[in-house]
């Protein structure tokens, strides 16, 4: 699916008003080959530790979007080229990171979509600390497991259920 976030917002003003459709803050940079992507969310809450990111991406993605609340840290990367390839191989359609990524040249040839706050060359810690399948606070919106994520050049939307145009 190639979402058009502007059309979704226009068609679902009632959901925007009642909070069942939310718009993330416009703070993300785009990476990966897919400029637009959509799917149900899988969620992680981590801080400067990407162990659970690898674990999540090793599982079949089944067309899902991995939403990572990295606490907005700008001190290290949570996703790099190896994890981008793993996501592509295992059927994830996208990754949204409240934090940093690295290996942008490698990520930009992965056939997935990625949104992140920034780029940082340093890798993260590996302590197996964090939570999966929990509600996460992303910039401007809470995301719960199973919410639908819609991403294109105009923004990132979070819906409590799958939307049609």
UniProtKB/Swiss-Prot annotation:
A divalent metal cation binds at residue 103. It catalyses: 4-hydroxy-4-methyl-2-oxoglutarate = 2 pyruvate; oxaloacetate + H(+) = pyruvate + CO2. It comes from the Bacteria. Divalent metal cation. The keyword Lyase applies. Substrate binds at residues 80-83, 102. The keyword Chaperone does not apply. Gene3D superfamilies: Ribonuclease E inhibitor RraA/RraA-like (3.50.30.40). Pfam families: RraA-like. GO terms for biological process: regulation of RNA metabolic process. InterPro entries: RraA, RraA/RraA-like, RraA/RraA-like_sf. Its EC number is 4.1.3.17, 4.1.1.112. Belongs to the class II aldolase/RraA-like family. Homotrimer. Catalyzes the aldol cleavage of 4-hydroxy-4-methyl-2-oxoglutarate (HMG) into 2 molecules of pyruvate. Also contains a secondary oxaloacetate (OAA) decarboxylase activity due to the common pyruvate enolate transition state formed following C-C bond cleavage in the retro-aldol and decarboxylation reactions. This is Putative 4-hydroxy-4-methyl-2-oxoglutarate aldolase. It comes from Cupriavidus necator (strain ATCC 17699 / DSM 428 / KCTC 22496 / NCIMB 10442 / H16 / Stanier 337) (Ralstonia eutropha).
